[in-house]
Amino acid sequence: MAASPLGVWSEVGKLHQVMVCAPGLAHERLTPSNCAELLFDDVLWVDEAKKHHAEFVAELRSYDVEVLEMHKLLEETLDTPGGRDFILDYKLLDRNVGAGIGGELRHWFNEMPTARLAELLIGGLPFAEIPKGLGHGTIDAMREVYGPSAFALRPLPNTQYARDNSAWIYGGVSLNPMRMPARHQETLLTRAIYNYHPRFAQADFKFWYGNTDEEPGLAALEGGDIMPIGKGIVLVGMGERTTWQGVSQLAMRLFEEGAATKVIIAAMAKERASMHLDTVLTFLDADKVTAYPKVVDTIRPIVLHPSTSTAPFDVELPTESFLEVVAKALGIGAFEVIETGGDTYAAAREQWDDANNVVAIEPGVVVAYDRNKHTNAKLRAAGVEVVEIGSAELGRGRGGGHCMTCPIVREAVDY
């Protein structure tokens, strides 16, 4: 059980517990021919990525943050009554692996060590690695025709960015339907962990959204767009990865449960460089943020309030800027905004390299990539303590420290 009640009550309060997912087998499956489909800009030097991720985890632990690793949580979940069946029942559906092979794969999976099964569920399983003779000839045919390039289970390298497939919002969690096909099956694994792992199965928290077998339709939500900032306010980016269908349902559920006082939507352009709100804006302290103005200044705010009619919520379209609307909601005069550093060219490069995607360990202390020298210097000049980590490989899927952490226990801050 967690030492503190589960829940995330701010973006910058003292961080007590996070989930991460270290680079591993899934990244070893990346090739020049499949990396774009799997949402990576290039293949990784995996050993270097592992080293820098381990350094990241060590830095978090040095500040007394409990770091939970997804591979280990998944392994322990597979050993619980119901956990293994829950995952395999879905993963081995005909629509996921093709007709006629799920039963034999299940038997094979149940004979292998649990740690190996957990590794394959994240790392992927090529047809070429399945024992010959399984699958009534189907697997042998796929192996013969496609060789190592065809997967029975697709690798999930974007689990490295643990922020996205679930999001803790105050006293509960949203299990997020992901926008891109390469990430669709991530949420199944976190759903299993939160429902079956002993750490969570007996804990006191609510599922705000997604703990159902209902197909999401056009609804998409990703955790990099979701920020519970305090006073019951939730920011939600709505751009490349999060849709109105997802935002509106999440807001409705939060209001129905009395879990939010307002949801402030950041309507953004649908661009990869700013795929989530946290790629252009993160919090440094209660009244201090880092932002990429070229995008943040164009955000259109939409504010949803608990309903005063038969509608699921009331809708407000403010005329102020997004940051002005957020500051007003928190009851502060204005944010101190530290913009992406360097000239026009350097700022564009550093934003692309996640300069504005920092994660707060506590108020005024953040983890940032070492490559973003101009922005980090500006943060330090503004009184922010910047803990730098290696970045050459970790950012190839477009995510920094904020993306690589799923906070589970974080304190509130005073406003």
UniProtKB/Swiss-Prot annotation:
GO cellular component: cytoplasm
Pathway the protein takes part in: Amino-acid degradation; L-arginine degradation via ADI pathway; carbamoyl phosphate from L-arginine: step 1/2
Catalytic activity line of the entry: L-arginine + H2O = L-citrulline + NH4(+)
E.C. number(s) listed in UniProt: 3.5.3.6
Subcellular localization, as worded in the UniProt entry: Cytoplasm
GO biological process, one term: arginine deiminase pathway
Keyword Cytoplasm (UniProt): yes
Protein name: Arginine deiminase
InterPro entries in alphabetical order: Arg_deiminase
